[in-house]
Amino acid sequence: MGLAVTQNGLARATSSLSLNRSIMLMAQDVYREPDDTIIVGNDTDGYTFALERGGELVLGSNSVTEVLPDDSDDTAPDSQVQKPSVIALEGETIVLQSDSRVTVTGGDISIEASTNPRLQGSFGGLGDPDASPAEVIVESGAIIDASGDDTTVVSVARNYVQVEARGNELADSPLQRDGAIRDETLVVDIREGTEFLNIEGAVASIERDVHERLSPGGTITIQSVGRVSIEEGATLDISGGSVTYSGDQVAPSQLVTADGQVLDMADADPNLVYSGVFGDFAFDHEKWGITETFLPALSYYEAGYIEGRDAGILEINAPGIVFEGNLIADTTAGIHQRMAPEDLAAGQFNALTRSYN
């Protein structure tokens, strides 16, 4: 922190499952002046210390400022919240020179230009852009990147969870609580789901590494009490990342109804009577004097595929905005997502200004 800050090198941090990281570059000045009223800080001999001047922050050409996921193989369930990592740039004038790069994988990038750091909450789009010298300039060739991670590779078999059909799992299927399926271990495809039993606990226990947890696109927020200028050739990237599923052998469960139908778990009606789980059991038809034998369930090879993640958000808030750069908000629609495109969110671009050029 200082009234003039220049970053010409490499500033890097890494995110983990348990810790998000931040890089904060602030061009601000701490000074004192006589004042009988304490605004912030401690009163020392009639003076008040406060951050009241924004300065000049420059990210030099070819500089790199980045927060990346670490290379750990550690995993955690979705119940463990993954806080986004942050890069914050603050000053009165903020310049990202040509070929500079700011990157937070699937995280938040905040750029705020203000003459007075104490009044940062006053950003608004209805003022006069010429009334303040505050400005954010992103030069041609500069890159601001909050895109999601696309390096995760897991087995397609992870989509199949084992669930024991017991009290909690059959809470919404009263007909099955004392039926032939109770206490059986069932394998369910979480992409298709099932109404037969509750699989939420099994799904919540699926563990993911930090790369997968950072695969959705992040957020880029640029605010100024004066102007924001994104020059032609500058790039802002909020693309969604992806997860690659490798092919594997899978063996989802099937249920056999009392009249001999074999149903996939996605089609299993909890209001039907079942004889058992398809695979290596015999069912005696006493009325007809015959025994029907079901062979073990066969596994099969499921091919791999890519699953895209949501793109992120770009928000620009200033009285004067010139956006001539490139906005990238790509998403990858995998084979399963092409059948349900509403499950993949596109990027958002929100601009609040008096006049948009």
Predicted segments with their positions:
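Extracellular and secretory-pathway beta-repeat/beta-biased strand scaffolds
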Residues: 1-357
